Amino acid sequence: NVVHYTFELSEVNIGRRYDSCISGVPLKDLTSKSDMVQDALKEFDGGKLIIKEFPTKSANINKIKFHIDRLVSSDFEPGLIIIDYADLMISTKAMEQKTWELEAIYEELRGFGMEIKIPIWSASQTNRLGLDGDIIGLDKIADAYAKAQVADFIATFSRNMVEKEKNKGKFYIAKNRIGVDGKVFGVDFNPAAASIVLQEFDEQVKLEGDIQSLYKKYKDNKEGWG
């Protein structure tokens, strides 16, 4: 079971993206091919999904806790919480600087996840340096230090102009407390169906040369690679 909190898009828009991703029907065709979507959703053997919308910069960890408690009391046991996204929350503490507030928000989310033993995932944006980057490292995540120190796992997704034309991209493991990091994987990206899929091993091997050259180029031009 998944709980998806959205602080930017509406519940309807988020729901449409899930419908498209699960069914494979492009977003623009969801209405005209509603029967196909319904059939795909009926066959879907995953858990249940709750989408909850809060206005931007109106929710803190206490609101999330309260809502989760209500779901649990209604016999809905979440196995994953998605925060879309943490930068648009507010902290329970008054902070003078944005960086401090972001660090507090991520610490509160991580603490709550440890308390209820449920993974919490969020997304973030790059800073200006990351807009033209082939591989997005921790230094290119907006207000990276405050977030990176708290997060257990960080992965980045990026595309150059050639990859955009081919609906491809790169998935880079920037931090991993319980496993290997510094790895780059090719992905198939279908924006029409809100889908990002890691490539199969044989497809990955075909792209290994290009990806490794990008990896080496990035590594050779960065200090403190890790």
Where on the chain are the PLM-derived regions?
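Structural recognition of the conserved hydrophobic beta-strand(s) that form the central parallel beta-sheet
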Residues: H4, I82-I83, I118-Q125
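Helical mechanochemical/support elements of P-loop NTPase systems and associated helical scaffolds
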Residues: S10-I14, K33-M36, K57-I64, I82, ...
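Short, glycine/acidic-enriched loop or turn micro-motifs at the edges of active sites
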Residues: E11, D87, R128
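C-terminal regions of RecA-like/P-loop NTPase motor modules
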Residues: F44, N62-P78, M114-I116, R128-G226
